[in-house]
Curated annotation (Swiss-Prot):
PANTHER family, A to Z: UPSTREAM BINDING TRANSCRIPTION FACTOR (PTHR46318:SF3)
Biased composition regions of type Low complexity, renumbered to the chain: 659-671
Keyword Methyltransferase: no
Myb-like domain ranges (all copies): 14-76
DNA-binding region range list: 112-180, 196-264, 298-362, 400-467, 486-552
Protein name: Nucleolar transcription factor 1-A
Alphabetical list of Gene3D superfamilies matching this protein: High mobility group box domain
Biased composition (Acidic residues): 593-658
Biological-process GO terms, alphabetical: positive regulation of transcription by RNA polymerase I; transcription by RNA polymerase I
Keywords, ordered alphabetically: Activator, DNA-binding, Nucleus, Repeat, Transcription, Transcription regulation
Subunit and partners: XUBF consists of 2 polypeptides of 82 and 85 kDa, encoded by the same or closely related genes.
Species the sequence originates in: Xenopus laevis
A single GO cellular-component term on record: nucleus
Amino acid sequence: MNGAAGGVTQAKMTAPKDQDPWSQDEMLTLIQTMKTLLPSQDNSKFKTTESHLDWNKLAFKNYSGSMCRQKWMEISNEVRKFRTLSELILDAEEHVRHPYKGKKLKKHPEFPKKPLTPYFRFFMEKRAKYAKLHPEMSNLDLTKILSKKYKELPEKKKMKYIQDFQREKLEFERNLARFREEHPDLMQNPKKSDVPEKPKTPQQLWYNHERKVYLKLHADASTKDVKDALGKQWSQLTDKKRLKWIHKALEQRKQYEGIMREYMQKHPELNIAEEGITRSTLTKAERQLKDKFDGRPTKPPPNSYSMYCAELMANMKDVPSTERMVLCSQRWKLLSQKEKDAYNKKCEQRKKDYEVELMRFLESLPEEEQQRVLAEEKMVRSRSGQADKKKAADERAKLPETPKTAEEIWQQSVIGDYLARFKNDRAKALKSMEGTWLNMEKKEKIMWIKKAAEDQKRYERELSDMRATPTPTTAGKKVKFLGEPKKAPMNGYQKFSQELLSNGELNHLPLKERMVEIGSRWHRISPSQKDYYKKLAEDQQRVYRTQFDTWMKGLSSQDRAAYKEQNSNKRKSTAKIQVPVAKPKLVAQSKSDDDDEDDDDDEDEDDDDDEDEDKEDSSEDGDSSESSSDEDSEDGEENEDEEGEEDEDEEEDDDDNESGSSSSSSSSADSSDSDSN
């Protein structure tokens, strides 16, 4: 029997095969940590306390919270959970010696009697009288009547009960102090946890302060009375008063962080998470209020339509919210293109002003707060990167509005009536309109067909105007087309550069130094490695050409014309720009090796900017935004122009695949090859 029991014990204490066995020190560490998490007055059943433990706080080393719990179950299974008579007798002996220790202290015959509150004094005085007057009433009904009578008492009569209470309270406090001196063994407070108290929210700080003030004026008030009196006052406080408590809460949280970090150093075994220390005590509304008073600018509407709706809704407060949106949509559609353009221009100006004000606000903040605001704004680390993205969005917005069909123009004119008929159910309204249009006679459709033809002419006219007089931004900056495949590197050197730039290995270096480092690394690699990168670039070029052909075939005739027009304009502009001009930094250099290396740098800047252009439409914000300086963006635009030519002329792609996208890139690759050889 004993052998079998010993086998069971060993099996329980042994860890499963898929985890490391626990050492004795580790098990003792687990038990010691559990001790620190026990409540100060642990009077519940062990199962109850065990179920309330936060096992994630017990995690340490490679052991998770669930693993710690499993190990505790194994250990506790080996410990008896009943008490012997010997142990019970020890507790009984302690109870006989100190019968009033703990919760029974107030039953001690010498413990001073607590004074009655003013209300209870009134209640005890009047209860017998009212019970005789209303014998049919229950105790509950009598209490309700007397409570109401006490509240209706004039302050002068109430003051009598309050003064009696305060006099007896002072006497009680004196007697309690004497009792503590005479019975120090009974007054020993249980050892409290040394974990620092968590910081309070602004509302909690305000409530504690107001509670003390309220109790001074209403000494007889119960906890419920205080809560009822103060419950709604916080929401009615002015912003200025609420801000006072927000500042106090922030100060308290800062002090808590410092104390808690010292505590963590003294108790590393507790494994306290950093998030628990730095968690904000402010709500979102309180944070916004503080930022507003600190000078944070209000974010403008994201687009011209939202701005129009915001202005319109300010004068439509009596209209239900569902109808407001319908009315906004209808009125927006009735605006002329000139009016819409004016709103668009106004919106863009507000965004520019907002960016300037936000940067000014950020400069006034400490670094920690700057990071928080930047995270909230979803801005990239480099501020100029956002400006580049905004410019690209501007160019997309400047394309002419696509022409509408006859059915779309008709639907736009009658949508309000159909929505009213179907109680704002858009799906039903659209379905009904489609049926009506199909059953409409040709004579009725002629007017809408003519309007559609006029809209088509308008689109072609605006498109031709845009082509004839391209703005500086459209001429110099490429407009992104939806679904356009990302360009592949033109040669081995570009592929090598992209790889180093994308893996983040050189992110600690400034852009110029990054390019120099890439050039020197390219010189150092072997010819076989260069051939490897060259082959990778060729493979990617083949895949890119296939994707590009498929994408071009999927474009509408209008989009294809716009794309070709854009590339032809870029060729004209780059033909004027691409005049060989020596950079100032090259004048003082005489060695050919240094010239080649600078060419490599320029080419890499092109690659880096090209990557930035491609990343502008993605949702991720990365380090590529650092390459948005004026000189680099110009180089990137030239590189894009030349690649755009090759997209249009596939035969040139085949010829230039090995040599590169520009004279600078080919010369850098050739010179670097020759140097390595």
